[in-house]
Each structure stands twice: as C-alpha cells, then as structure tokens.
Swiss-Prot record:
Entry keyword set: Cell membrane, Disulfide bond, Glycoprotein, Immunoglobulin domain, Membrane, Receptor, Repeat, Secreted, Signal, Transmembrane, Transmembrane helix
Domain of life, per lineage: Eukaryota
SUPFAM superfamilies for the chain: Immunoglobulin (SSF48726)
Subunit and partners: Forms a non-signaling receptor complex consisting of IL1R2 and IL1RAP.
The Ig-like C2-type domain, residue ranges: 29-120, 134-221, 237-342
TM annotation in the entry: 348-368
Descriptive protein name: Interleukin-1 receptor type 2
Classification lineage: Eukaryota, Metazoa, Chordata, Craniata, Vertebrata
Disulfide bonds: 28-116, 50-108, 152-207, 258-326
Amino acid sequence: MFRLYVLVMGVSAFTLQPAAHTGAARSCPVRGRHYKREFRLEGEPVALRCPQVPYQLWASVSPHINLTWHKNDSARMVPGEEETRMWAQDGALWLLPALQEDSGTYICTTRNASYCDKVSIELRVFENTDASLPFISYPQILTLSTFGVLVCPDLREFTRDKTDGKIQWYKDFLPLDKDNEKFLSVRGTTHLLVHDVALEDAGYYRCVLTFAHEGQQYNITRNIELRIKKKKEETIPVIISPLKTISASLGSRLTIPCKVFLGTGTPLTTMLWWTANDTHVESAYPGGRVTEGPRQEYSENNENYIEVPLIFDPVTRKDLNMVFKCFVRNTMGFQTLRTTVKEPPPTFSWGIVLAPLALAFLVLGGIWMHRRCKHRTGKADGLTVLRPHHQDF
C-alpha cells in the first residue's frame, strides 16, 4: 500500500515520461517474490494478478503508472506483439490456454516518473494427470461431526462481475448429484456445504467452473485435498474462584483471580471475562486503575484450567461499592460468579485489652489465696502448742 501511495503521489509533481528516459528505468529494484505460487493445469485459463496493484485499486492507480510484464528476467516484455494466447488487462496477465512451456517466473514492474519496483510470481503448469494431483491440490481441513464448508479457491479473476458462474463438484472424480443430502453446492457461490462431516469424507475433491471467452468455453479446475480432524472435546465450565467477598485495605494492590475448571475440555473455545456493575471493566475504569490481567491456560493432574485476574492498583473506596462478576462461556454452557471488595475488620481487639486485666486478676487472686492459706496454717500451729498446757492443767 505504501508503494501504491508513492506511485500515485509522484504524478502530482512530475509528468509521466517514457520509461527508457527516466532514472527509475535505470534503477528498478526487485522487491522480492510473491508468497503464493500459481500451480495450474495445462489447457485451462490462467490469470496472474500483479501483486503491487490489487484489483480494487486498479481504476484509481492505472492512470498514474506504467505496468509491464517480463518472464525469467528477459528484457523482452510479455505478451509479445504476435502473441495471441497472452494479454494484459486490468493489472493481470492472462494466458488462455496455458501450456507447460509457460511455466516460469513472471515479473511485474510498476513505475512512474519518480518510482519503480518489481515483484515476481512463480507459475507452474502441469499436465492434467493423477500424478499431478498432490502438487496442484489445495489442502482444506474440516472437523469431525460438524457442519463444514469447502471453498473452490482462486476464482476471483474469473467470477468477477459475473453472476451466472456454475461450479460442478466432484469427489474422487465422481460428480456430486444435486439431490445429494450429504453435499450441497450453493448456487452463485464457490461453496460446497458438507453435512455431518465423517472420516470417510476425506479425500480429493474437484470443482470445475465453466468460463466463456470470445464464444469459446473453457474449464477452470481446482483440486482440493480434504483432511478431517477430530473434534476437540468440550465440557461445561465451572468457576471455582473467587470467593463472594474479598478483604482488602484501601491503598493496597489487589489481584482477584477468576479460575475456571474445564476438565478434559479445550480452553481454545472458552471465553472468560470480568464486569464491574454489569459494565466491561475498561468502560467502568477508563483510567486503567482496575484492569483484566493476561489470560492463563494450564493443566493440573491432566485437567485443564483457565484464569483471568482482576487487578486493582490500588484499591479505593469506589471499589467497595462495586459488584464484580466473572463470566465464562463456551458451546457447552455459561456461568457467572459475583464478588465484592470489603475493608478488613478493625485490628483493635478486646482480647488485647482484657488479657492484661485477666493476668492481673490471676496474680491478685494468687496472692489472696496464698495469704489465706498461710493464715489458716498459722491457726493450726497455735492449737498444737496449747495442747501440752491443757494436759498439765
């Protein structure tokens, strides 16, 4: 997109000059190879889109740039003047029909008076045989026991501005009938619906689009290798924390984890989030004092858990009047748990005050008991001394 901007803006200050007389023509860097390789069948139409110019931008960009094609670093532009199978149109290079000898690297060059770059595209044309199938097939994956959709790929250049395109689908080279309850081709789209995907649905599929050009009909074939993956099990999520009331001192930093038990279920499709007074945390605390922490997924004893903490930095009196709720949802169920933040009870305790009094009471009581016992012992000793005198009398 940046290159397109430079190309368009460059014409506002410069008049487009012939390519041979510009500095850009003398130095035109190659930006690299397009990530996608084009694997096509011999005898069918091929359209190579210039990577620098998407179709939706062609109308606005085309008046300001010069677009050319070359093959295999050759100085000769394609298509040649006498070439009847190949032409350039709306930012794409068309080959109709394509031959194996057309295989190679095609370089799209875009330039104006002040800018120029090149991007290459790799094209390989295969003979239409079973041996070519692994090379030209698009891998697509559906999940077992679900409703799936296969897509006939890379047809945009041939279906653009056309509503009458008809696609015939095949499985293992056998046509899929219209009355087939398992497969349904959606008219006007490139989609094949697959009901209740089964393991035996795996294999090679072929979609064929009929394309008309100058009164002649051509087939455009795309092959798909369907792979089936097992459906990951899901269980009903259960929130096991937090507690209904959390104690925290004003001014302290607090983290309240919302921990969810999933058992053997997958955490990938389970959503977990917090609210404050039935509002998203980001909306309730736009300043970011209270936020959701990063999501954690882990296993304990071969059982899966997910956790999202609610972080207070710090706790203020406003938080004491809020109701916080943790929500969890997946395809099996939905659950919520509420919690509130409260100040801890005062640290003053009557036990601290009464403990010294109790100790003093015990000490005084001990002294009183000691004196009483000593007084009684003294009386007993006096009686013992008087007995002999009574006997003498």
